Amino acid sequence: MAKPILRIGSRKNTRSGSRKNVRRIPKGVIHVQASFNNTIVTVTDVRGRVISWSSAGTCGFRGTRRGTPFAAQTAAGNAIRAVVDQGMQRAEVRIKGPGLGRDAALRAIRRSGILLSFVRDVTPMPHNGCRPPKKRRV
């Protein structure tokens, strides 16, 4: 025989308000991942916990427009706007990938007013690892 489902908890017992607590973050790391199809900008604290992120896709760009420099610039601006409000003044920038949005995202980060301690390219380079996909024939 099936047991009846007990209704435990009501609206009074649930947590109210926003789950995000606003922390003051003086220093952080800005990760820019620029592929040919999209650009993703993630802002973390120095321990690696994500504070804010944005991508060209979440900014409303669809299809081939996601890989453009303007889309990367918009994504970087959106991700940084949130952390500037939380008091971030200094940051490191780590850029990964071969995409068109690398320089545009870096330009948007520089314009935001955050002091950059260094800019590092962390694109993974194979030491002759996997075989690349076959050449595209159009």
Swiss-Prot record:
Assembly, per entry: Part of the 30S ribosomal subunit.
Tagged with keyword DNA-binding: no
Name of the protein described by the UniProt record: Small ribosomal subunit protein uS11c
Gene: rps11
Gene3D superfamilies (alphabetical): Ribosomal protein S11
Family matches, as InterPro entries: Ribosomal_uS11 (IPR001971), Ribosomal_uS11_bac-type (IPR019981), Ribosomal_uS11_CS (IPR018102), Ribosomal_uS11_sf (IPR036967)
Residue ranges, compositional bias (Basic residues): 9-23
NCBIfam families in alphabetical order: PRK05309.1, uS11_bact
